[in-house]
Amino acid sequence: MSAQAAVASAPGGATQVEPEYKLQVCRGLALVVDDNPDITEMLAAVLRHAGYTVSTAHSAPDALDAALARHFDVVVSDIGMPGMNGHELAQVLRAMPEYRSIPMVAVTGFDMYDDYDRSREAGFDFHLSKPIDPVALTQAIRRIRH
């Protein structure tokens, strides 16, 4: 929340203060997963700017731990991570009742036509290619949620 105040006073008169409050709407909790810390932070910043409270993970197993510890309203994940990849993460999350219908967006360097199909089959709602356009990411999440 932020606040500002307009102050006015006439000579010899009372001072009037009119506070203005701006509440930032929290759109929910988002989990960002990428093995590259710079990309993780960039994606987190985009989602924070869009009104989300963001948690980050740098591997699929860490993301699963986070998802078991609290419920997220949206998951944005890289695909090409060492060990357990993003497709495997999506499949495990979609098997959990609380994650069956939340928006899940794949963000990846894999940009061939069949990569999009693999992402959908794994459980992602959208497949966005890197470099990520912040507007495209937030629009994709909005489309899924509405």
Tell me the role of every PLM-derived stretch:
Residues 81:
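Receiver (REC) domain active-site loop signature in two-component systems and cognate sites
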Residues 51-58, 66, 128:
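Short hydrophobic/Thr-rich beta-strand motif most characteristic of the beta2 strand and flanking loop
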Residues 1-31, 44, 135-146:
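Non-catalytic signal-transmission and effector/linker regions of two-component phosphorelay proteins
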Residues 41-49:
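Charged docking surfaces used in two-component/phosphorelay signaling
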Residues 36-40:
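Short acidic/polar segment at the start of the alpha1 helix of CheY-like receiver
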Residues 70-76:
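Active-site beta3 strand of CheY-like receiver
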